[in-house]
């Protein structure tokens, strides 16, 4: 599956206690579970899915999240750009598939083992979370992050070598992105 890199990483994070993983085979069910969790907690909840029509199956929950201003984060695996439009399996056009229903769309480049990737990924994820919770004057709501993966999609049994930079984050826990909180509006003011 195109989302195998997500599956392996999420399973490892769940085992380490860094997150609680809820696995659903049906994408619609996964999206509506995440929608309910986000609606109840008022915190962003991610939904990871594979490529192709699986992404379209999330559309109902994305629309509900948009109309109800619920911070839902859609993270979809995708084919790399060079395999799009070639007739390859599961090459549904996922770029901006949710249109105006999402507060922000971003597509990352295919992952590469080189310095600087950690900062790029963390910055993009921080900006997506900020958009989902409505900072910077935006309305709270769903966002979509599309991530193309090249093969191999499963981890190597023998790694190539260490990652070229620390994955620990910034010194002292400093954020990757600083966002200004939205100013509350008076009742009746738009």
Give residue ranges: language-model regions.
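N-terminal alpha/beta PP-like core and its mobile active-site loop of ThDP/TPP-dependent enzymes
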Residues: 1-190
């Amino acid at each position: 599956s195109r989302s195998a890199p997500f599956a392996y990483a999420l399973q490892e994070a769940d085992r380490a206690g860094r997150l609680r993983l809820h696995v659903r085979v049906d994408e619609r069910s996964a999206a509506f579970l995440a929608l309910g969790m986000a609606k109840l907690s008022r915190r962003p909840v991610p939904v990871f899915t594979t490529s192709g029509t699986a992404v379209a199956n999330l559309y109902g929950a994305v629309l509900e999240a948009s109309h109800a201003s619920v911070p839902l984060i859609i993270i979809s695996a995708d084919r790399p750009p060079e395999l799009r439009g070639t007739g390859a399996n599961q090459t549904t056009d996922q770029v901006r598939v949710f249109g105006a229903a999402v507060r922000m769309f971003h597509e990352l480049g295919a992952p590469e083992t080189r310095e600087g990737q950690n900062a790029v990924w963390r910055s993009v994820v921080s900006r997506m979370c900020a958009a989902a919770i409505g900072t910077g004057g935006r309305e709270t709501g769903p966002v979509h992050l599309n991530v193309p993966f090249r093969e191999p999609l499963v981890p190597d049994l023998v790694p190539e070598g260490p990652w070229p930079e620390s994955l620990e984050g910034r010194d002292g826990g400093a954020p990757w992105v600083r966002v200004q909180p939205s100013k509350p509006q008076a009742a009746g003011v738009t």
